Amino acid sequence: MVPSLDASVLKRTEDNILDLMCLMLETRDVRDIPESTTAAVSDVTFQRLSAFLSYHFGDPDLAPEHAANSLRVSPRYVHKVFQIHGTTFGRELLRLRLREADRLLRSSSVRSSSPVPIAEIAYSCGFCSQSHFAVRYKEYYGMTPSERRLGGSHLAKVD
């Protein structure tokens, strides 16, 4: 009879197996590995990378190397996983930052008693300057952060 393991032991075991599979994919000839295995590992790694980005997107210095170190994979593999999923590390990071900024702008309207300054929203979402944030926000949503705050939801891109 197999003794039952607590959830933390199972989680660590799962993480170790995934780490070993990722390492195997990086060091072996991919032609030797069944496609279903590489796809499954890529999907799990993408989920882990997405979770990492969701937690750390506010860091203005966040780079693929940080995610790679955290997941114990190479930066090259990080780029490859995002490419397989039709995006890039930078594009996904920008999307997360802009979505959070949009949420904050909508929840802190001009009509509220103390709206959060747009610059503060930009910096809290990982942007290094308010002007860069405003340019990227307008490219993505088709309106400026100020227009959004004034109630321009009818113009906004829906995610």
Which residues are covered by each model-predicted region?
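DNA-recognition helix of C2H2 zinc fingers
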Residues: 134
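Alpha-helical bundle regulatory/interaction domains
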Residues: 1-75, 82-90, 96, 103-131, ...
